[in-house]
Every structure is written in structure tokens, then in C-alpha cells.
């Protein structure tokens, strides 16, 4: 009886970009099997998977940027039963030796999977936590814009004529904005007309953003109640703090193997310092989940 030869495993590495992904296939001994590139569309993802499986058995893939450009491809790969591993950044030593190119980065991603250097499971982006991330992102931009609006309004009042400043300046932002939003005319000169229009526009922008923030906060409260009700019972943890922690963990928190892994992800784990002293990872202030 004739037996079909058993398919060997191939490993896929992908360097992701906004419009195009570059992929490299290697076998289990590290030889390059093939290289290709596909557009970042649903059809392109299917073509990539079909292309890879046309050579041998595809079970593992290393993808750069699984939280950004590679997110859609990672989800499609997982739906096809491929184990996706996150490639945090290209190996710098290999990049220095071989130069920077998309095929090289894709090859390095595949080799990181083969060598066991890449073992991070990508964050899932398809549930309540991803919804929280979207709301939180919109909320942060609204807070920033609202702060800019009141700062610009106050800056104009500081340099305005004394009589106008005395009438419109109020300590509480709500009172100051309310007065400026009702402005009709401060005078007939070009300066006073421009000042009237600008103050009124900034005040109404602030009020619009305040209303938008109220809606976003309500949505965030509802989402955190559904996804992390127990977390909200902890002292000092409100909807925004809970959302930040949940977004850090992702929709699949089981990917974090220990409490130490979460601390490292938050930038709050100890780092070995000078003379054997340990210090918290305060060198990473951009990590929202690790802020005091």
C-alpha cells in the first residue's frame, strides 16, 4: 500500500506594515523555504495562509506588531488554527550584521519562533476589553482637547482689555465658559470682533467636549461593570483605573503566566540596579497601568 509522505512543519515569520505584509517561511532546521508579500486585506490574509500551507504543515507563526499593523492578520491566523506568537522587536544584533530589510525582519521573526525566543501570546482584541480600549482612547483625546480649549480661552482673557477680563474671568472653568459662550459683541473694532468670535467658539468647544466626556464616562462605567465588577470593589479602583488594568491584560488574561508577568507588563517589576540594588521599573513612565 502506498502512503502519502507526512508533511513537515514550516514556520512563518511576518514583518507587518500599513499596506503590505512581508512573509518568510523556514523549515525546522532553519532553511528559508520561500518569501512573499501580500496586501493588508482579508483576501491578502487568506492568500498568505493558503500560500504557506501549500509548502508544508503550518502550525506556528511569528508576527510583528500584533497589537497594531499585525492585529488583523493575527486574528485570521488564529481562526485557521495557527499558533501566533508575538515578536516584540527585531533582533538588533542580527540587524547590525545583516542590515535592515523587510524580508530580513520577517526571517528573524520566524527564527525567533524556531529558537523558542518568541513565546509571548498576542493580546486578544475582540471583546469587552477591546471596547474599553477604544472608549479610553477617545476619552484621553477629549480630555486633552478640553484642557487645551480652556487654557487657550484663559490665555486670551489674560491679554484682553481689563474691562473685558473683569467681566468674563472666573476662577471656575464652568462659570468662565458659560459667560464666554453667551457673548454677543465686545465692540466694533476688528480686534474685539475677533476676540468675541474666538472666545465664544472656544467656550462652546469646551462645552461640547464636556458633554462628550460625560457620554464616554458612562460607556466606560458600563463596560467595566460587565468585564471587571470584582476589580471595581477594590479600594481606590474606579472605572478609569479598572479599564487601564483590564486593557493591559487584554481579552485573554490567561496569556499572563504569573503575577510577575503582569507586573513586568505594567512596568512595575523590580529591575536589578547598581551594586545589586533592585529598583522598580520607573524608567518606563509611558505605561499607564504602572503609574502611581
Model-derived features: where do they sit?
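A detector of single, family-specific signature residues
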Residues: 1-292
Amino acid at each position: 500500500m502506498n502512503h502519502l509522505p507526512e508533511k513537515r512543519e514550516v514556520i512563518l515569520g511576518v514583518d507587518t506594515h500599513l499596506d503590505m505584509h512581508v512573509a518568510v517561511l523556514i523549515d525546522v532546521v532553519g532553511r528559508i523555504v520561500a518569501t512573499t508579500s501580500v496586501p493588508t486585506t482579508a483576501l491578502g490574509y487568506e492568500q498568505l495562509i493558503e500560500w504557506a500551507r501549500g509548502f508544508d504543515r503550518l502550525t506556528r507563526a511569528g508576527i510583528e506588531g500584533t497589537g497594531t499593523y499585525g492585529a488583523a492578520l493575527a486574528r485570521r491566523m488564529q481562526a485557521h488554527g495557527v499558533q501566533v506568537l508575538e515578536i516584540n522587536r527585531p533582533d538588533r544584533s542580527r540587524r547590525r550584521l545583516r542590515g535592515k530589510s523587510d524580508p530580513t525582519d520577517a526571517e528573524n521573526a520566524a527564527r525567533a519562533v524556531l529558537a523558542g525566543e518568541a513565546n509571548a501570546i498576542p493580546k486578544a482584541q475582540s471583546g469587552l476589553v477591546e471596547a474599553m480600549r477604544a472608549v479610553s482612547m477617545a476619552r484621553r483625546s477629549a480630555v486633552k482637547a478640553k484642557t487645551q480649549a480652556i487654557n487657550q480661552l484663559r490665555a486670551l482673557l489674560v491679554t484682553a482689555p481689563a474691562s473685558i477680563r473683569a467681566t468674563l474671568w472666573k476662577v471656575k472653568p464652568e462659570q468662565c465658559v458659560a459667560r464666554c459662550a453667551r457673548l454677543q459683541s465686545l465692540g466694533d473694532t476688528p480686534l474685539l470682533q475677533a476676540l468675541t468670535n474666538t472666545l465664544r467658539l472656544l467656550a462652546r468647544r469646551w462645552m461640547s467636549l464636556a458633554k462628550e466626556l460625560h457620554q464616554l464616562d458612562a460607556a466606560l462605567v458600563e463596560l467595566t461593570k460587565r468585564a471587571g465588577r470584582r476589580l471595581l470593589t477594590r479600594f481606590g479602583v474606579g472605572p478609569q483605573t479598572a479599564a487601564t488594568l483590564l486593557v493591559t491584560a487584554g481579552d485573554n488574561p490567561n496569556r499572563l503566566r504569573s503575577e510577575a508577568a503582569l507586573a513586568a507588563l505594567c512596568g512595575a517589576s523590580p529591575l536589578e540596579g547598581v551594586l545589586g540594588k533592585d529598583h522598580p521599573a520607573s524608567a518606563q513612565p509611558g505605561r499607564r497601568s504602572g503609574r502611581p
